[in-house]
Structure formats: C-alpha cells, structure tokens
Amino acid sequence: MRIILISAATFPSDQGIRTISAILKKAGHDVKIVFMAYSEDYSKFYHNRELNQLVNICKNADLIGVNCYVSTMPRAIQITGFLKKKLKKEIPIVWGGIHPTLFPQDCIKYADIVCVGDGEDAVLDLAKAIENKKPIDKIQNLWVKDKNGEIVKNPVRPFIDILDTLPFVDYDIEDHYILENHNLRKFKEEDLNGQIFFLTGRGCPYGCTYCSNNLLNELYKGKCKSIVRWHSVDYIIEHVLYLKKRFKTLSYFDIRDDTFSLRPLSQIQEFCEKYKEKVNMRFKCLGDPKTISEDKIKVLVDAGCTDIIIGIQGNEKTNRDIYKRGQTNEQVLKAGKILSKYKNKLAVMYDVITCNPFEDAKDVIDLIRLLQILPKPYYVSVNNLVFFPGTGIYERAKMNPKLKKIVEESSKLNYWDRNKHILLKRKDMYLVLILNLMRGSVTENRFGLMPNKLINYLLKPSRIKYNLNNPALTYIGLSFVSVMDLTRERIAKPLYRSTPVNFKVWYDKIRYRV
C-alpha cells in the first residue's frame, strides 16, 4: 500500500510519526512522510500553492495520516479539507496524535478515522484491512465514520509495554518531504540542523494540571502494567549508533523524555558507560528537581551531557495547590546546588510558567525570589500558561465565567507570545512583565537584560503597589517586549534558519552558556 503521513508540527522532529512510518515500512508498505513545518504563529495558515503541491504528493496514496496537536488543529483541518476537495479519488484520512487521542469527538468531524492512543498497532491493522478490502470498524483504538456519517467508537488496546519491540524510527530521508519557502521539497540531511530529537521512553507518572499526560494516564488506567515505559539501554545505544553513522553532520542528540532523570540510577549508569564508550557525542536531556541526584548528574556529565532543562514551573505554593506537582522549593534549591558543581561543563536551563490567573502577586514575587537565590550561572526560560483542553487547570478555569475568554483564546497563542498573553489575562501585569523580562542568561548581576539591582528596585512594595494601580509603565514595557518578540520571530529566526549547519551547531553550543 502507498501511505502518506503528514506532520503539521512546527519542526521536523516528530518521533511519533516516524515510528508509525517505521512500523508500516517493516510490514512492506510504501510510506512517505511530509513535514509541513510552518511558522510558530498558529494564526497563520498554508497557502494554496503549498497545499496543491501536497495534493500532488498524495494523489496516488491508498491511505493518508495527519498528526495533530491542539495548537496545529486548525492547520490539520485546512490540510484535510483541501485534500478531500482536490483529490480526484476518495482516499481515507486518519488523524492521530495527542489531540485526537484526548478529543476524538472533535476530530472525527473532519477526519474519516481517528486513532486514539498508541497508534503503531492500530494503524498497522488499518492498513492491512484496507489492503485486503476488509471492514475497519472493529479495529481497537479507532473511531470510524461510515458512509452514513455514523461513528463507531472502538475501545483502546493496552499500551505497548515492551518498547524494544518497536523498530528504529524512520530516518530514511529519501522518502521525506519538507515545506520551505512555500515549496515542498525533498528532505535533506541539513534540515536536521546537526541534531536529532530522541525519546528513550514513554509516559510520565506525574499529574501536573497544565499537562495532557495526566489525561493519557486516565485513558489507560487499568489497561497497562506501567504508565512509564523505557527502551533498554542496548536498544538506545544501537539506535543512536545507527543514526550517528547515517548522518555525518550530526553533532548531538537531544533526549526529549519528559524526565530522563526519572530513570533509576543503575540504568543511567549503564547508559552513560555504554554511551561514552560507543557513541562519544554530546547530548542533552530533561529532568526535574525531585529526581536529580549527585550520582546521576556526575555520570551524565562524564558521558557527554552538556545541557539539561529542569522544570521548576512555579513557587512551592503554586506547584502544590495549582499545578499539583508536589515539588518543594527545598528540592529545587538542592537540585540547583548539585547542578552548579558542574557549571564549567553543564549548561542548565530552568523552565518556569507565568501569566497564571490563579496566582496572586505574592506567588509571582516568590517565584522571582526563588530564581534570585538559585546558584548561578544558568539560563531561565519563561513560558506563559496555555490552557490545553481537558487538562485540570483548563477544567478549573472553565468553571469561572470571568476566565471564559482567557480559556478560549490562550490555546491559540504560543507560550512565548509574551505581550499577547499578558494583555489577554491582565492579572498582576507589572509583576508578570518583570518575570518575562528576566528571561535569558543569568549571572550574579543580571537576569537576561535586567540588572539584579533593577529587579530589586522594581520589587519594592511601594513600586509594586503604584505600578499595579497605574499600569502606564507596564504598557510601555509591553510595547518593548512586543518589538523584541516581533524582531525575534520575523527577523532573527528566519536569518538563523538560513545559516549553514556548522553555524547552527556552534551557536547551539554557546546559546545557553553564561
């Protein structure tokens, strides 16, 4: 069978769709992947010129798959509608991804089939049924719309417990296309920018109210041995060795497990020993304060870990009462002290969330003060809260009539769109603006562009009281932020994308160094 898989994500780093492709190819199907990578401004849509090229790629397909997130759903709708209108033959279109998994009732309005949950086995069964002209309405994990518009809702099958049974993800770039400057062209090695995003496991045990992982955990409750599943170390090493040999411009791996540091120490030690011996290439990973330990960080750095992202998110009260993270300031500071011991070898980025209408002024101030006492240097990434449908914080906000507009509009914004988030939520704008301006490299004397002395001056009780009641200075600051963001998105990022891979690799090495 000829199958086209389409990713509407903003970057061509989608491991889910590559895994689906690998499963289908292993079964003998002819699969091509199209990365419709586009602007991070989710209000923008594809041009007809681009979609007509997509039609040409899809015209002889027997099955089309579209990957979809809540932020890219409008584009997935546009793609699906255009294909249905322009294709001369009727080709079934299946949607998959996190948003179709959590909201199949919304997605089935546009797609013929919706895949709920892990898609590997379900899509394989679907392709086999279509190829053999068999019914598809009894396949687990699939919602199917028949010719009369009736919807069959099949239950989900258990998670794939043993991840090592999956083939290596599909990086046969000869079969891939990517959108660039309004043209769909063949994928090139240079499009990887010297890096590969990589997952060594699936699942997250935490129930953070802003995250969709909690909904996945509920969906599979009682249907799996464990929510968190890992690839074996030998599988990972064999896979990355294959990719290293395959791509000569590859400079590093970016391990994107929600919390790589969640792995037991014995596994991390085994991974680091074999990675250093056989791969010997720099890598990045993500962690959280509760699972950071001296022993883990020591072996990770020794094996070549040069960057780590740690999620702080909020102050202790916000994490406990609003985000349900169960994380204390003491744990954050303890992790910070461990990480700072390796400051000459390890770049640390802390993620925080702001622009939260459930926080009060004291919560924002406490988070700023926590950042000020964390061991330096580090990089702080300030993200603005997005209410993803179905999450705990979304449901809580939906119950408040005053937050209805915020709930509806914030999911259309990118988390970095600072000016729009602050103006939309209009809660403690002065303090939220200060926190947003602290984004960037942090030393003993400054946070991003903000001198530490200036932050302390701006946080004097008299200044806070005055500026919360008189927002003129805040609006001036927001105008400055808007110009900064516009410059970054319209000028800096396009220029960066046009630079050679060698420059991108060099820039990545120094980007979060202080």
Question: Residue spans of the language-model regions?
Answer:
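Acidic, low-complexity intrinsically disordered segments
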Residues: 1-237, 245
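Radical SAM enzyme core and accessory elements
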Residues: 2-6, 25-26, 30, 46, ...
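Flexible glycine/acidic-rich beta-alpha junction loops that bind and position SAM and/or redox cofactors
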Residues: 40, 103, 206, 219, ...
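Conserved acidic residues
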Residues: 62, 112, 251, 306, ...
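Catalytic cores of alpha/beta
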Residues: 104-109, 296, 357-373
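Radical SAM [4Fe-4S] cluster-binding motif and immediate context
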Residues: 171-347, 354, 369
